[in-house]
Amino acid sequence: MTRSSGLGLGIAMIWFSALVLIPLMAVVVTAIDGGWDVFWSTVTNGQTAAAIKLTVFTALGVTVVNVFMGTLIAWVLVRDRFWGKSVLEVMIDIPFALPTIVAGLVLLSLYGNDSPVGIDIANQRPAVFLAFLFVTLPFVVRMVQPVLEELDRDVEEAAASLGASRFTTFRRIVLPSLAPAITAGAALSFARGVSEYGSLVLLSGNLPFKTEVTSVRILSSIENDNVPAAAAVATVLLVISLAVIVLLNVIQRRVAARG
């Protein structure tokens, strides 16, 4: 390692530590500062456990949907030509551009009490799923799309000329190349989902044991001046998110190896 590269690494690590590692460590320390009994009683509290369960399982479900639909949308954008393609390219990024509270208002206007399409899911669990789905849609699409654009289609054509079916070509050639991008998009989708708050405020109603998610539960603890409880819930989410990311990486490596 040269002196200049060592300096760059040092600056990068200091910056990363200041922005990410130290704040995360502070949250964990705050969570266990009151003792393990307090930590355990907080995260196993009925209302808190229900919020964690709803958040994690909804985020997992949304991630699965995004993996399939996001990859499909990316495929259509790259491989197909159709009228309105440029408009779709722009609209995919709308969830990125909209403030989450505005996203909540958009969804409430369409799926609330006065729904113009006759679908009212406000203050129900499907509202949580829909809100998560809306704000996480672009992640897999935007991770997979550039990889698809760079794939050598001659290899796919060669496989087809040798008698490989479209499914076999996709499974053995395309999917292993897309696996890292799909994994990254899935990880971002899950992380974005478990942290969502703004779009849920108007749409889900934040009803305990029904539609309350962990971000709302954390905010409630802070408003009640119970920072250790908020930190405890945040720590549980952190551990779960890290576990999911590790699992996704394992799956990605196995898919790539089989390809």
Located regions from the model:
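Amphipathic cytosolic juxtamembrane alpha-helices at the membrane-cytosol interface
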Residues: F57, W83-E89, R125-A127, L151-A184
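Transmembrane alpha-helices
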Residues: G10-W15, V64, I94, L98, ...
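C-terminal transmembrane helix and the adjacent membrane-cytosol boundary/short C-terminal tail
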Residues: R3, L7-I11, I22, Q145-A160, ...
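Periplasmic/extracellular loop-to-transmembrane helix junction in inner-membrane transport proteins
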Residues: T2, G6, V27-V64, V76-D80, ...
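Transmembrane-helix boundary motif in ABC transporter permease subunits
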Residues: M1-T2, D37-F39, G61-I92, L105-G112, ...
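Membrane-interfacial helix termini and adjacent extracytoplasmic/periplasmic loops
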Residues: W36-T44, A49, G84, A103-F134, ...
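Interhelical loop and adjacent transmembrane-helix boundary motif
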Residues: G46, V201-V246
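Hydrophobic alpha-helical transmembrane segments of multipass integral membrane proteins
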Residues: A18, K53, F57-M69, I73, ...
